[in-house]
């Protein structure tokens, strides 16, 4: 089958975006993997699918598939590319759209400066809802947050557990470039205490309003940037009393700005950052 696609990226986190709004797109996990393959396909961290919503009061449905073929709940950098895509394709002329994701809805706004502002929703810190198994563990309070000990290859790492619609484990490190992210990331991702696996975040505090971040993503490995990972890290840092909003997040792919008023109940995190169209094309996929 032949399939038209658009290649996009948000701070280096790259995507294959498909229009399933004006035409049916039903891909198998094997076809998703073929599209995302960097040697034999287009190459991407995730595949993004635009569809008609299945609930009332929203404009589009936003689905995300990791390069391993599995569908996931959320992708913040992809959300910025999503709104740029639907506007460029003429599917909407609105600057702000409401989008259905796997666990609720989010609002995406194209700003005058070309960056996209994403309402990322409210972070969840309840371990059961992340989910994270705490049986037999004793947490440690730091500020308004609870840190949990995690055995990583025989070393105890103290982590914050956060859900941004998808699960995150965030730890503070001294030097994010020197830290063994590629060694510890996959161990944390598949740790038995995370029944749905987890995105592993490694955060270096630069100042009260600035961090450096690397994320080993569930099902994708380390990516150049992770929007939900940036939000989870900032939320954890603010709760721990280490950061003040807004926070500039430096990733290998570029910078994101995260804002959050943690003093207001149910207040969402806001993420601002770039969305770039790289090229469009057509590919022959195996049936």
From Swiss-Prot:
Keyword Cytoplasm assigned: yes
Cellular component terms (Gene Ontology): cytosol
Record field: catalytic activity: (2S,6S)-2,6-diaminopimelate = meso-2,6-diaminopimelate
BP GO annotations: lysine biosynthetic process via diaminopimelate
PROSITE patterns noted in UniProt: DAP_EPIMERASE (PS01326)
Pathway(s) this gene product operates in, as recorded in its UniProt entry: Amino-acid biosynthesis; L-lysine biosynthesis via DAP pathway; DL-2,6-diaminopimelate from LL-2,6-diaminopimelate: step 1/1
Active-site residues, Swiss-Prot/TrEMBL: 75, 226
InterPro entries in the record: DAP_epimerase_AS, DAP_epimerase_DapF
Its job: Catalyzes the stereoinversion of LL-2,6-diaminopimelate (L,L-DAP) to meso-diaminopimelate (meso-DAP), a precursor of L-lysine and an essential component of the bacterial peptidoglycan.
Entry protein name: Diaminopimelate epimerase
Organism expressing this protein natively: Paraburkholderia xenovorans (strain LB400)
Lineage of the species this protein comes from: Bacteria, Pseudomonadati, Pseudomonadota, Betaproteobacteria, Burkholderiales
């Amino acid at each position: 089958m032949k399939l038209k696609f658009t290649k996009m990226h948000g701070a280096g986190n790259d995507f294959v975006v498909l229009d399933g709004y004006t035409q049916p797109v039903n891909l198998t996990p094997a076809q998703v993997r073929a599209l995302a393959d960097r040697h034999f396909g287009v190459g991407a961290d995730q595949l993004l699918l635009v569809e008609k919503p299945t609930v009332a009061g929203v404009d589009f449905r936003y689905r995300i598939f990791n390069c391993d073929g599995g569908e996931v709940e959320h992708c913040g950098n992809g959300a910025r590319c999503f709104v740029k895509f639907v506007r460029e394709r003429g599917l909407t002329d609105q600057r702000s759209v409401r989008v259905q994701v796997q666990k609720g809805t989010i609002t995406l706004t194209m700003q005058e400066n070309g960056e996209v502002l994403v309402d990322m929703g409210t972070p969840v810190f309840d371990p059961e809802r992340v989910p994270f198994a705490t049986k037999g563990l004793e947490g440690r309070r730091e500020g308004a947050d609870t840190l949990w000990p995690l055995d990583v290859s025989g070393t105890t790492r103290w982590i914050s557990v956060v859900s941004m619609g998808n699960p995150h484990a965030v730890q503070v490190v001294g030097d994010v470039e020197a830290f063994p992210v590629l060694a510890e990331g996959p161990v944390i991702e598949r740790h038995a205490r995370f029944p749905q696996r987890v995105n592993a975040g490694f955060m270096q505090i630069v100042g009260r309003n600035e961090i450096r971040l690397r994320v080993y993503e569930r099902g994708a490995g380390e990516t150049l940037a992770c929007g939900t990972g940036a939000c989870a890290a900032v939320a954890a840092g603010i709760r721990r009393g280490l950061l003040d909003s807004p926070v500039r997040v430096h990733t290998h792919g570029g910078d994101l700005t995260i804002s959050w008023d943690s003093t207001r109940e149910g207040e969402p995190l806001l993420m601002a950052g770039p969305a770039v169209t790289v090229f469009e094309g057509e590919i022959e996929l195996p049936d």
